[in-house]
Amino acid sequence: MRADRGKAGYTLVELMVTVSLVGILAGLSIVSFGRNWRAERLKAAAGETTAWLDEARRIAIQKAKPCRISINRAELSFSLDPNPDNPEEFCPDSLYGPLEIRNTVQNSGAIVMCSSELENGDPAQTSLSCSGSQSGSSSLIFTPRGTATTGILIKFHMPEAGADRCIAVMAPLGQIRSGKTTATGCDFTTAY
């Protein structure tokens, strides 16, 4: 004789356990996605800035004229900064358009940028605090040989993004380096 098996299917307990596990995994992935998304915003801002600075350096070499760059921390913008009293002193701003991070990088409203001159300091060992709103500006000059008159450290910060991003322009060579921040400064061993 055969035993009556009833209808085949899953029990309510099995379904509840499965739904609970799927919910937990989905919750964990959403948290991870948000952190990765913010880290990608910082990576994009650093990449755009590095490319813009490199092009400004090339313009100084091509035109055989120093290019002064103005860095506006509050607006997250970079622009060529000619001398209005002596237009021949620096590159005119008509040679290269400004870089405005908020317009270039999508969803970058929470990014904070800070900068500081490097006075014979190693950017890998220079700590730069970057929290809260920033104001003021910095400047940088690329010479006709592509060198920089002063070094500068630029840092991009976004809350809960993990590691911040930093860019260093090394004086006197004008070398532009990009990396992630560490507890003691910047790590330039891997750019991204």
Ranges and model annotations:
Residues 9-31:
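Short, contiguous hydrophobic alpha-helices characteristic of membrane insertion segments
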Residues 1-10:
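N-terminal leader/signal peptides at the extreme start of proteins
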Residues 2, 16, 28-54, 58, ...:
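N-terminal helix-rich module
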